């Protein structure tokens, strides 16, 4: 169970983020956003997207009511003069005041539910041109993704907890998988393990047997498990996203499939070893391409993207042949190399030249791979 006590974040009775750390996080993000506004000659910015709301508020504010929706029940306004507002309807106001914005320095602006006039009211308060992270008449489109990429200490503390708990939930579900279960059953037991921890599933690609080999994105279709199951998921809490994939096989793992996992782990190791400050998206794509060829699977990179940085998006960008995006310090990554039914995927953090696995599952079989003298560990298949 997690909750705010004052401005501290307490999880299961332990303080995860102190009030001082949270205050520092909020102030740093506010300053960064005001600098962004001044650099872009904007009087203010409207923030509606859930990932940006979570980023700006240090994971404190949850505006999501409709789960699949990218926006919630309020809009934030930050002005170049440093003022902060949230716009919402009168029916949402009591909960937002009590449970979301009570510890934050945001001024509410309220409307009847049938007469939301956020854009006009925001323009008047800002007194000049407005940017927005969602389209709108008279608004300048802006992306806040570049501001989100480098994670601060408080974000890393939350991320470590989320990674460890998502990994634990995944292993809990994996150990409950039995032949005869449907793909929907696999989704249900995994969702239960996550939701009990206060974690929201955001991507579900669960499949069994030949569907794993045939499809890279195999959404559940109700097939019943005979021998081989894949739990491929993303989870969210405090706006942060975790990616993890794990497998279980009943009976001896076929040698051909075991070889594909070994090769995928080697590609993963090559990507992790190359994930260093200053590396570009194109550099990393080339590393994956060369690694597949070196493992005897040339061209395998064509069949699916290889992953990229994560954080407040399941992928903030993905590695592409001409990608110009650049790796920064304190950035999270989720690489997902795969070879026809064999795949490895974890969420890791690059911090001061060191790769930290946030979703380690030491109770599962391990695949060790070395690149240029450095060893990297990926999860193998649980064989029952």
PLM region descriptions:
Residues 1-384:
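Active-site neighborhoods and metal-handling regions in enzymes and metal-associated proteins
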